[in-house]
Amino acid sequence: MQVEIEKEEDGRWIAEVPALRGAMAYGSTKKEAIAKVEALVLRALADKIEHGEEAPEVNHVFTVAA
């Protein structure tokens, strides 16, 4: 899953995974934002699997696009 990262005007970083609607997280550093969104996505995928929902096929867990 691709992680898109961008620095906001206020200095915070936002990381988003477009393949999973609503998966975005802010951090005070680029590394923090990426770590937060990765944790969020893993929890969301685990939740889908636990509830018998179809999860997207994942060949590589994360790829960061600057």
Predicted regions: what they are:
Residues I5-L20:
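Short aromatic-glycine-(Arg/Gly/Cys) micro-motifs in beta-strand/loop hairpins
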